[in-house]
Amino acid sequence: MAEPLLSEHQHQPQTSNCTGAAVVHEEQNSERPPSAEERVPKEDSRWQSRASLQSGSRPGQEGDGGLKHQLPPLQTNACPELSCLEKGEKGQNGEDLSTGGASPSAEGEPMSESLVQPGHDSEATKLEAPVAGVEEPWGQQQRQLGKKKHRRRPSKKKRHWKPYYKLTWEEKKKFDEKQSLRASRVRAEMFAKGQPVAPYNTTQFLMDDHDQEEPDLKTGLYPKRAAAKSDDTSDEDFVEEAGEEDGGSDGMGGDGSEFLQRDFSETYERYHAESLQNMSKQELIKEYLELEKCLSRKEDENNRLRLESKRLGGVDARVRELELELDRLRAENRQLLTENELHRQQERAPPSKFGD
């Protein structure tokens, strides 16, 4: 009976010392700067003993030694007299812990864990809190760098496109004029750069022919044509006059023929320029010599035609003189005929009384 009472009497001040040491340790930890707590890692394998790493058995199976080696340094610092308490119990009781020592060690393990666990959790939360605070602005910066803020407003001047078949007649006319001006400008730029260009494919002459007003069939507004033609007017002249009045064989009038002639001349000039650009130096020299020969032939022919025209001009003057002489003789003949008629009438008239 004396031994249990003595052991209980010895336990009371020891537990009080243990709790007091824990309180002092917490006060010291509170006085420590926060930087010291941040330096302590959560889990460090360097504090584990080699025996615990080598042994594959659970803690508590090998006795008190295994438990002491597996405890972290925070637990031993929090309660340094725990090992002394266990040694005192072993020395006072004199019992062998190999058989029944598992239960005290097992009971002591949760106690030590319960004593040390609050401090460990508080340190872990203190370590995690500043790390999260550091990661939050860094993540915001990364998101800002990755995603660009949209600072532009949508433009109010939107181009309202409409298909061609939905345009009105005025809009179609403006669109066609704009396209024709643009095409002519582009063709002029390309031609100035020396690039081959195709003729502007337009159907405006068809539209002009289609838009022509119907002729007014009221005959009262037009002057009547002479019913009879003079003798010197031939049928060919009549056909030519009719063709001119109708606007030509193509039905386009004078403006259409001028447009076609201008288009043909432009196309021929472009084709000729392209052919000269594609020719080599020898071919150009040969072409130049041929053109000189052709020019000399044309000049000779022109001189010959001029001489002939001069001769024909002299013949024409003679013919004109003869025509004038003929007219004069005809007039004189008519005058003689009239005089002869008067003499005949006088001869046929009866003699007067005065003459008898």
Curated annotation (Swiss-Prot):
Instruction: Give the start-end ranges of region Mediates interaction with CCNT1.
Output: 283-311
Give the primary localization class. Answer: nucleus
Region named Required for inhibition of ESR1-dependent transcription = 307-352
InterPro entries the UniProt entry points to: HEXIM
- According to UniProt, the name of this protein is Protein HEXIM1
The cysteines joined by S-S bonds are none
Where is the region Autoinhibitory acidic region?
A: 207-247
Where in the sequence is Phosphothreonine found?
T233
Q: Where is the composition biased (Acidic residues)?
A: 233-248
Q: Is the keyword Coiled coil assigned to this protein?
A: yes
- Subunit details: Homooligomer and heterooligomer with HEXIM2; probably dimeric. Core component of the 7SK RNP complex, at least composed of 7SK RNA, LARP7, MEPCE, HEXIM1 (or HEXIM2) and P-TEFb (composed of CDK9 and CCNT1/cyclin-T1). Interacts with the N-CoR complex through NCOR1. Interacts with ESR1 and NR3C1. May interact with NF-kappa-B through RELA. Interacts with CCNT2; mediates formation of a tripartite complex with KPNA2. Part of the HDP-RNP complex composed of at least HEXIM1, PRKDC, XRCC5, XRCC6, paraspeckle proteins (SFPQ, NONO, PSPC1, RBM14, and MATR3) and NEAT1 non-coding RNA.
Query: Where is the stretch described as Disordered?
Result: 1-160, 209-259, 337-356
Stretches for region Interaction with P-TEFb: 199-202
Name the gene that codes for it: Hexim1
Give the sites modified to Phosphoserine: S98, S103, S230, S234, S249, S257
What Pfam families would the database entry show? HEXIM (PF15313)
Q: What does this protein do?
A: Transcriptional regulator which functions as a general RNA polymerase II transcription inhibitor. Core component of the 7SK RNP complex: in cooperation with 7SK snRNA sequesters P-TEFb in a large inactive 7SK snRNP complex preventing RNA polymerase II phosphorylation and subsequent transcriptional elongation. May also regulate NF-kappa-B, ESR1, NR3C1 and CIITA-dependent transcriptional activity.
